[in-house]
């Protein structure tokens, strides 16, 4: 550590430890990790990502493998992302896209929700709209073009060759296109059709609706008299409703489904088996997934069987989360544990992963987020409430408490360093023949450098004391 001028402690070039004020240490990959100002500053390079942040105000990360440059400003309030010569950003309700930052005439968008929309579409056509007064908006909500004037008085949309006109939304609408037709005077009457696949209509919605279906392998029709009853019969299935949606019976081949009433009692038999007394208790089984709950959504169990993996999850929301992933052999038998994860919210989280080189584990306290590994939180917020952290991987261990008031770093059996800032620190570097200790960041210190003993007094006095 570069706290005293002589090499009485096993510092390497660029390393320093001033507790929560500033620290710099090499990780197992030989990359320098910097932290400072308590929880407010951090910078590191890991897994191909270069990162630095002033938490929670600003952070920036660059990943060379996928050419991604990501900036967060008071996340989730604002963000800027550049990738493959494209830029997207948001700040509050303002959003923007530039699809080629190297071309000033490229496709772009600017939205100031919910009032202003402008840009240039993929065909090079400019557009602008002010809601609700009027204008043209392209490439929005799955539509190629949208035009409105004094919404909801009038608007029209285009998607491929399908054109829709609407007056006094949602009352009058008329849609026409290749193999598509829709018309409504809501709620009095409406009809729609798609190719030769189906035809639907309603009268005095939602009280009466009906449809005819001519899908290949599934033909028939049905009706709904809401809220009294309904019936649908196709060539491969049949469904009855009584007081919809409360009571329902459906049969589709070997599969049956019953609501008695929905959502409280739900029962299914066949390839998918299910029984719910919601929200008190329930279970569901498919070929590869089994779930169970009690007092939903508090107690949840989920098991997933895949050809090469088993995933087990247990939740006592929002307090306890546990997950285990196990590997299988060619016969489908579980033979090893690949990873585990547990969280006792808001106190701690612990994860462990087994890789080709050994086991990597990570412990963090506190853990205020009820969600797991949310990128924006990890980049901008979690360091603020991380009072203690322990990371271990093959050949490397790092422990930090109170943002560096206590820190311990181990690299194999050759290097170790422990600091209780600003009281005492000690360490050893076998490769460089260094070891030593110091009190008060140099008030008193003793160490060896390549076998030569040295004494440190009053921060400035450097006294050789023999070999």
Regions found by a protein language model. Give the residues of each.
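Outer-membrane beta-barrel proteins and related beta-barrel translocases across Gram-negative bacteria
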Residues: 11-467
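Bacterial N-terminal signal peptides
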Residues: 1-5
């Amino acid at each position: 550590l570069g706290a005293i001028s002589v090499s009485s402690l096993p510092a390497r070039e660029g390393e320093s430890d001033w507790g929560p004020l500033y620290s710099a240490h090499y990780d197992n990959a030989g990359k320098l990790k910097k932290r400072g100002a308590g929880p407010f500053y951090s910078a590191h390079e890991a897994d191909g990502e270069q990162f630095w942040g002033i938490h929670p105000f600003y952070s920036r990360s660059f990943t060379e493998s996928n050419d991604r440059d990501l900036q967060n400003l008071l996340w989730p309030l604002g963000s800027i992302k550049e990738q493959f010569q494209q830029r997207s950003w948001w700040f509050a309700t303002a959003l923007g896209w530039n699809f080629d930052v190297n071309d000033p005439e490229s496709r772009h968008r600017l939205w100031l929700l919910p009032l202003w929309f402008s840009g240039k579409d993929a065909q090079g056509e400019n557009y602008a709209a002010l809601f609700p007064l009027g204008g043209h908006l392209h490439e929005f909500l799955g539509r190629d073009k949208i035009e409105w004037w004094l919404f909801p008085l009038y608007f029209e949309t285009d998607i491929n060759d399908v054109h829709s006109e609407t007056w006094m939304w949602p009352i009058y609408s008329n849609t026409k296109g290749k193999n598509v037709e829709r018309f409504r005077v809501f709620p009095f009457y409406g009809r729609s059709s798609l190719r030769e696949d189906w035809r639907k209509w309603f009268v005095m919605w939602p009280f009466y609706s009906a449809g005819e279906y001519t899908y290949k392998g599934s033909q028939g029709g049905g009706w709904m008299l809401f809220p009294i009853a309904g019936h649908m019969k196709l060539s491969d299935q049949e469904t009855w409703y009584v007081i919809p949606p409360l009571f329902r019976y459906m049969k589709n081949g070997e599969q049956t489904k019953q609501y008695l009433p929905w959502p409280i009692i739900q029962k299914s038999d066949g390839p998918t088996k299910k029984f719910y007394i919601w929200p008190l208790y329930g279970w569901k089984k498919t070929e590869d997934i089994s779930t169970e709950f009690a007092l939903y959504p508090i107690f949840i169990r989920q098991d997933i069987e895949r050809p090469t993996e088993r995933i087990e999850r247990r939740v006592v929301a929002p307090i306890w989360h546990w997950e285990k992933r196990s590997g299988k052999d060619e016969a489908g038998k579980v033979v090893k544990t690949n990873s585990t994860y547990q969280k006792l919210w808001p106190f701690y989280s612990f994860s462990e992963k087994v890789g080709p080189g050994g086991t990597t584990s990570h412990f963090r306290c506190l853990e205020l987020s009820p969600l797991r590994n949310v990128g924006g939180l990890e980049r901008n917020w979690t360091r603020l409430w991380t009072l203690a952290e322990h990371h271990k991987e093959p050949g490397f261990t790092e422990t930090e408490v109170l943002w560096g008031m206590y820190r311990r770093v181990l690299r194999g059996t050759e290097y170790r360093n422990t600091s209780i800032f600003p009281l005492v620190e000690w360490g050893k570097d076998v490769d460089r023949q260094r070891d030593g200790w110091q009190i008060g960041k140099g008030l008193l210190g003793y160490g060896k450098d390549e076998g030569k003993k040295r004494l440190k007094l009053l921060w400035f006095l450097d006294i050789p004391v023999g070999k």
